[in-house]
C-alpha cells in the first residue's frame, strides 16, 4: 500500500504534467472534469495532512492572505524597454544600423515574436522552484507580486527537466485573453463592479491586487520572452534556442515565434501577424524583432534604456473621427506651450479619448485645424492620442481660427519662439505657476529626488497656496503647514516631512536630473556626474569641456552651460545645499602616492556585481587612486565586467581595452 507521501507526490506530478500539456503544449489529454477531480483529491489529502503541504504544490496557487501594500524588489539585471518603429522605412533603417555596427559579412538572423499587450514581469527560479516575481516598475525596481504570480496556472511553480540553472530569472508578459476579459466585464456589469476599458488594464488590475485570492479568480496567462539573471548553469547561444529550452522546462512560449533569415522575411512575418491579429484571441500591438545570435547581441550592446539588437515594430494605431470643441494651451516644466484639442469624447482602441495633443503651432498650421473641425484621432503607439488630419470635406460653417497665445495663459509673461525651434515657451520661469508645478513634480519624482508620498495634488496645492516657490522651499515645510492642505492629517503630513528629510541624502547624478535642465535625462545626468565628479567642476565647465562627456553634443552642452550661468539657478542650488541636500563627495587622492594596481587608471564598471554594490566598488576604486568613468573611450585603461555586461563591454573589446571580471577585481582590491 502506498504511503501518504507517495500518493501526494504522484498526484502533484500528474497535475503538473497535465498543466504542462494544457498551458505549454496546448494539447490537453484529459477532460477538465478529470483535472478537477485530481485537484480535489490532492486538496483533500493535504487538508488531512497539512504538515506535508509543499510550496510548489498545485494547490498553493489559490492565493495567500491580502497584503497591506506591495514591497519592492530591485532587479539584479535592469529590465530595459525597447525602441519602437512604426513603418517599414524605420525598420529597414534599424536593420541597416545593425548590419553597419556589426562591421562584418556575418549573416544576421532575426527571431520574431508577438508584442503582447500586457504587463512585463520577472520571475526568479532557484534550483527550479519559483521563489519571487516582480513587475518591471521603473526598470530598476519593481513591485513584489510573488503571491499573485503563483496563482497563474500557466506559470509553473517548479520547472521540470534536466540541467536547470541554480538561479534563473525568466522574463515575460502576463496578459488576459479576450474571452477572459469579456467575462470579467460581464460579471462586473451584473454585480455593479469595476468595468475595465481593455484587456491590458484588466490584466494590470488583476496582477496588482493586494488580495491574491482575487487574482486567482482572474484567467491570466503568460508567455516568456527572455532571461535576466543566470547563475549555476548554461543556456543555448541563440535567442530562439533559449525560448525552446524554457519550453522544455515547462514555461509557456508563444507558438508564433518565428526565425527570419532576412529583413524581407521579417516584413512578411509582420504583415502576416497584422492580418491574423483579430483572430488571435488576445491583444497585441506589434511584433518584437531580435537578433537571434547572443554573440551578435553582445557585440551590438545597449543604449541608455534599450538594446541595440532589438526593436518593437508597432502596428498602426486604431483611429476614430470626432469634433474639436476647443483648443487650450498647457505650460510644461521648461515653459513649453503645448496646444491641446478638447474633443467630443470618442472611444479609440478601447479607451475614451477627450483630449489630444496638437504639439505646436507648426502642427496646427500643417493640419489647417480650426475649432469645430471634424478630425481623425489616433492613439499613437496605442497610448498618446493625437490629431492625424482634418476632414476638410465635412468642415462645419461655424469653425473658428486657433489663435496661438503671445502671452502665457497662466502667468501672462511673454511667449517667445527661438529661431530654429518648433516649440514656443513662456519666459516667466519659476514665477509662472504652471512651470513651478511641473518643475517641482519632476524634482520629487521617483527617478529624481524620490520623495515618497508627495504626489501631484500636493504639489498643486503647495504652489496655489504660495507655500512653495522653489525646490528648496520644499525642505522648509513643516507638518503644521502641510496640515493646511486638503485631505492632509497630521500623521500624513509628518510622513511627508520625514520623506523630505530622507530625500536629502541622494547622489550627484540624481540631483542633476532633479534640477530639470533642458535635454538632461537620467543617462546624461549620470554621464555628467561621472565625468566631472563635483558640482563645482561642472558649474565651471565651458561648453567645449562639456562636449567631452560621452553623448553630450553642442545643444545639450549649451543648455547645461546656460543653466549654471543663470544666477537664479545658482541661488536655488545654494539654498538646496543649505537645507542639507548632499551626496557622497569623491575622495581626491594623489595617485602617485598610492601603491595599487588601480592607481592613476581610468576604470569603467559595467554589469551587475554580486559581492558588493556598484557604489561601494566605485568608492573603493577611488580610494586606491582610480578615476571611475561612466563610459568607455580610448582613454579608458580598464573595464570591470560583472554579470550581464552590455555595450560597455562590447566597446572595450572593440577598442582592445583590458577587461577583468568581479573575481579578479576583488583579488586586486585585496592585494
Curated annotation (Swiss-Prot):
Which residues constitute the catalytic centre?
115 (n6-amp-lysine intermediate)
Give the enzyme class: ligase
Q: Which reaction does it catalyse?
A: NAD(+) + (deoxyribonucleotide)n-3'-hydroxyl + 5'-phospho-(deoxyribonucleotide)m = (deoxyribonucleotide)n+m + AMP + beta-nicotinamide D-nucleotide
Question: What is the residue range of the signal peptide feature?
Answer: none
One GO biological process term is:
DNA replication
What is one Pfam family matched by this protein? Answer: HHH_5
Domain (BRCT) ranges: 593-671
Which regions span the lipid bilayer? none
Q: Which UniProt keywords apply?
A: DNA damage, DNA repair, DNA replication, Ligase, Magnesium, Manganese, Metal-binding, NAD, Zinc
Q: Which residues bind Zn(2+)?
A: 408, 411, 426, 432
EC identifiers of the protein: 6.5.1.2
Q: Quote a single Gene Ontology cellular component term.
A: cytosol
Got any disulfides in this one, which pairs? none
InterPro entries noted in UniProt = BRCT_dom (IPR001357), BRCT_dom_sf (IPR036420), DisA/LigA_HHH (IPR041663), DNA_ligase (IPR001679), DNA_ligase_AS (IPR018239), DNA_ligase_CS (IPR033136), DNAligase_adenylation (IPR013839), DNAligase_N (IPR013840)
* Residues binding NAD(+), per UniProt: 32-36, 81-82, 113, 136, 173, 290, 314
> What does it do?
DNA ligase that catalyzes the formation of phosphodiester linkages between 5'-phosphoryl and 3'-hydroxyl groups in double-stranded DNA using NAD as a coenzyme and as the energy source for the reaction. It is essential for DNA replication and repair of damaged DNA.
* Name assigned to this protein: DNA ligase
Q: The organism's lineage?
A: Bacteria, Pseudomonadati, Pseudomonadota, Gammaproteobacteria, Enterobacterales
Amino acid at each position: 500500500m502506498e504511503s501518504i507521501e507517495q500518493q501526494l507526490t504522484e498526484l502533484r506530478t500528474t497535475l503538473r504534467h497535465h498543466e504542462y500539456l494544457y498551458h505549454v503544449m496546448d494539447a490537453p489529454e484529459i477532460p477538465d472534469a478529470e483535472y478537477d477531480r485530481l485537484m480535489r483529491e490532492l486538496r483533500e489529502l493535504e487538508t488531512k495532512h497539512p504538515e506535508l503541504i509543499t510550496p510548489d504544490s498545485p494547490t498553493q496557487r489559490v492565493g495567500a492572505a491580502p497584503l497591506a501594500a506591495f514591497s519592492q524588489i530591485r532587479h539584479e539585471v535592469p529590465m530595459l524597454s525597447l525602441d519602437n518603429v512604426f513603418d517599414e522605412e524605420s525598420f529597414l533603417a534599424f536593420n541597416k544600423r545593425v548590419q553597419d555596427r556589426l562591421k562584418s559579412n556575418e549573416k544576421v538572423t532575426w527571431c520574431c515574436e508577438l508584442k503582447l499587450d500586457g504587463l512585463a514581469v520577472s520571475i526568479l527560479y532557484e534550483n527550479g522552484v519559483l521563489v519571487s516575481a516582480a513587475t518591471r516598475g521603473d526598470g530598476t525596481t519593481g513591485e513584489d507580486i510573488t503571491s499573485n504570480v503563483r496563482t497563474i496556472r500557466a506559470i509553473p511553480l517548479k520547472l521540470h527537466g534536466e540541467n536547470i540553472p541554480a538561479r534563473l530569472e525568466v522574463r515575460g508578459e502576463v496578459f488576459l485573453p479576450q474571452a477572459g476579459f469579456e467575462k470579467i466585464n460581464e460579471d462586473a456589469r451584473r454585480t455593479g463592479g469595476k468595468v475595465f476599458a481593455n484587456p491590458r488594464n484588466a490584466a494590470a488590475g488583476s496582477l496588482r491586487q493586494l488580495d491574491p485570492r482575487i487574482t486567482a479568480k482572474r484567467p491570466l496567462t503568460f508567455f516568456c520572452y527572455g532571461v535576466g539573471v543566470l547563475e549555476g548553469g548554461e543556456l543555448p547561444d541563440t535567442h530562439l534556442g533559449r525560448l525552446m529550452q524554457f519550453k522544455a522546462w515547462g514555461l509557456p512560449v508563444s507558438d508564433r515565434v518565428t526565425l527570419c533569415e532576412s529583413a524581407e522575411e521579417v516584413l512578411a512575418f509582420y504583415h502576416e501577424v497584422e492580418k491574423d491579429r483579430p483572430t488571435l484571441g488576445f491583444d497585441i500591438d506589434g511584433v518584437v524583432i531580435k537578433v537571434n545570435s547572443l554573440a551578435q547581441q553582445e557585440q551590438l550592446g545597449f543604449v541608455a534604456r534599450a538594446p541595440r539588437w532589438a526593436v518593437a515594430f508597432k502596428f498602426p494605431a486604431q483611429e476614430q473621427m470626432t469634433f474639436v470643441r476647443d483648443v487650450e494651451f498647457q505650460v510644461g516644466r521648461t515653459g513649453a506651450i503645448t496646444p491641446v484639442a478638447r474633443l467630443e469624447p470618442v472611444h479609440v482602441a478601447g479607451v475614451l479619448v477627450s483630449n489630444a495633443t496638437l504639439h505646436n503651432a507648426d502642427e496646427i498650421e500643417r493640419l489647417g485645424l480650426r475649432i469645430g473641425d471634424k478630425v481623425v484621432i489616433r492613439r499613437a503607439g496605442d497610448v498618446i492620442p493625437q490629431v492625424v488630419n482634418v476632414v476638410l470635406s465635412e468642415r462645419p460653417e461655424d469653425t473658428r481660427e486657433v489663435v496661438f497665445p503671445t502671452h502665457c495663459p497662466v502667468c501672462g509673461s511673454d511667449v517667445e519662439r527661438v529661431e530654429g525651434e518648433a516649440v514656443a515657451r513662456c519666459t516667466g520661469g519659476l514665477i509662472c505657476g504652471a512651470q513651478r508645478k511641473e518643475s517641482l513634480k519632476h524634482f520629487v519624482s521617483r527617478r529624481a529626488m524620490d520623495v515618497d508620498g508627495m504626489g501631484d495634488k500636493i504639489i498643486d496645492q503647495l504652489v496655489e497656496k504660495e507655500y512653495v516657490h522653489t525646490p528648496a522651499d520644499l525642505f522648509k515645510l513643516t507638518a503644521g503647514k502641510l496640515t493646511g492642505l486638503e485631505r492632509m492629517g497630521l500623521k500624513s503630513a509628518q510622513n511627508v516631512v520625514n520623506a523630505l528629510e530622507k530625500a536629502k541624502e541622494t547622489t550627484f547624478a540624481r540631483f542633476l536630473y532633479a534640477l530639470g535642465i533642458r535635454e538632461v535625462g537620467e543617462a546624461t545626468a549620470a554621464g555628467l556626474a561621472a565625468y566631472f565628479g563635483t558640482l563645482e567642476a561642472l558649474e565651471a565647465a565651458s561648453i567645449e569641456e562639456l562636449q567631452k562627456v560621452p553623448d553630450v553634443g553642442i545643444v545639450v552642452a549649451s543648455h547645461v552651460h546656460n543653466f549654471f550661468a543663470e544666477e537664479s539657478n545658482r541661488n536655488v542650488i545654494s539654498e538646496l545645499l543649505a537645507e542639507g541636500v548632499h551626496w557622497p563627495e569623491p575622495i581626491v587622492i594623489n595617485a602617485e602616492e598610492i601603491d595599487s594596481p588601480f592607481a592613476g587608471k581610468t576604470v569603467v564598471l559595467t554589469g551587475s556585481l554580486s559581492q558588493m554594490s556598484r557604489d561601494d566598488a566605485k568608492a573603493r576604486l577611488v580610494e586606491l587612486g582610480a578615476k571611475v568613468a561612466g563610459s568607455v573611450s580610448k582613454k579608458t585603461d580598464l573595464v570591470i565586467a560583472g554579470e550581464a555586461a552590455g555595450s560597455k563591454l562590447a566597446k572595450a573589446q572593440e577598442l582592445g581595452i583590458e577587461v577583468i571580471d568581479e573575481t579578479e577585481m576583488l583579488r586586486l582590491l585585496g592585494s
